[in-house]
Amino acid sequence: MSAKTRLGIMMFLQYAIWGAWAPVLSVYLLDDLGFTGFQAGAIYALLPLATVLSPFIGGQLADRYFSSEKVIAFLQLTGGVLLIVCARATSFGAMAGLMFVYCLLYAPTLALTNSVAMINLKDSEREFGAIRVWGTIGWIAAGLMLSGWRTVGGGSGGLMMGGDMLFLAGAASIVMALQAFMLPHTPPKKEGVKPWAFLESLKMLKAKQFAIFIGITFVVSTELEFFYILTGPFLQSDSIGVSPANLPAVMTIAQVAEIFVMAFGLSWALKRYGMRKTLAIGVVAWPIRYVIFAFGTPAWLVIASLALHGFCYVFFFVAAFIYVDKVAPADIRASAQSMIAIVALGLGRFLGSLFAGKIQDVFTTELGTNWTGVFLVPCALTMACAVAFLLFFREEEGATAAA
C-alpha cells in the first residue's frame, strides 16, 4: 500500500470520527437527555478549548519524545474507549467530564495528522489538498453510515438510538488507532515547536487593516457554532420535520458543498475576483444562510441552504488562512497561522458555543424553541460583520502594512 493511500485513509478516519458525532450530538443532548441549550453549548465548547491547549500537550509529545504515528495510535485508542463510555453517560457532569478528557486527546491529532501528511509527501504544497479532501469525504461517510445504522435500527427509539453517534465515533477511533501503526514512520524532531509561537505574530495587529480582518474573523467564528450546534435540532423540529434517521445524511449536504467549492470555486474566485472580493462573498453568505433559517420556510429551501456552508466556510475561513499566509512576513508566517487558528478555531468557537447555547435557552419555553428568534441573532451579527468588512477592509493596504 502506497504512502499516499495510507495517508488518505488516515485523513478519512480522522474526520469520520468527528463527523460521526458533531452534527447530531446536540439533538441527543437537548431532546433525549434534556440538557439546556447552555449545557449543550458548553459540551461543544470543549473541543475548541482543547484546540487551544493541545500545542502544550500532544504537540510537545510528538515534537520531542515519541514518533507521531505512535502518539496518534495512543490518543485515538484511549479516545475511542472514552467515547464508548461517554455514549452511556446521562448526566451533564459525567458527559462534560468525559468529553473534556476526550477532546484533550482528540485535539492534538488534528495537527499531528496534518504534520504526518506534510512530512511524508514529496511535494506537500501540491499534494496535501488531495490527501486532506479524504477527511471531508470521511465526515460525509460517517453521516451516511449513521443514517443507515438508524434506518436499520428502526429510525427512532430502539436498539440503534441513544448515544449511537458516540458509539460510531468510538469505533472509528479504535480503527484509526490500529491504522496508525501502518503510517510512515515519523520520528520526533530534535527541537520541539514552541507552544507560545503565535505570540510572535501579535506585532502584525499594529497594521490597521490586519487588525480589522482579525476582529471580523473572530466575530464571524463565534457565529459558526449556531450552525454546528443548532442546525440539527432545528432541522429535526416540527417546523422542518427531518426524521432522526435521515438527519445525519441531510447534514452532509454542507460537506458535499464544501468539497465542490474547495475543488472548483476557491481557486477560480481568487484568480477572477482577488482576495478581498472572495472574502466578501464568504462573509456575505453567512447572513443569507441565517436569514433563510430564521424564516424557516419553505422546508426545502432551508435544507438546500445547507449548501451555502461551502461558500461560508471555504470562501471565508479557508481564504482567511491563505490571506494570512500572503501578508505575513516570512519569518513569522507559521506564527501568524497559529494566531488565526487560535482566534478563529479556538477562542472564537469556544465563546460561540456558549453563546449559541445561551441564545437557544433565551428563545425556548415550555411550548418549544422560537427558531426565528434564535437565528435572527447570528443573522444580525454576521450582517454587521459583512457591512464592516465591505466598508473598512482594504486588502492592498493591509498587505503592505502587515509586511
Predicted regions and their residues:
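Juxtamembrane intracellular "pre-TM" segments in multi-pass secondary transporters
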Residues: M1, L183-I216, S237
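Helix-loop boundary and gating motifs at the non-cytosolic
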Residues: M1-P48, Q209-V250, F317, S353
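Hydrophobic core of transmembrane alpha-helices in multi-pass small-molecule transporters
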Residues: F12, L82-C86, F92-L112, V116, ...
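Helix-to-loop junctions at the C-terminal end of transmembrane segments
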Residues: L53-S67, R150-G154, V261-M275, Q360-D361
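Conserved MFS/SLC helix-loop-helix module at the cytosolic interface between two early adjacent transmembrane helices
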Residues: L53-T90
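Structural signature of the two symmetry-related core transmembrane helices
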Residues: K70-I84, K277-I292
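Multi-pass alpha-helical transporter architecture, strongest
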Residues: C86-A87, S173-P184, L376-A403
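A membrane-interface helix-boundary motif in multi-pass transporters
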Residues: G148-A172, K358-T382
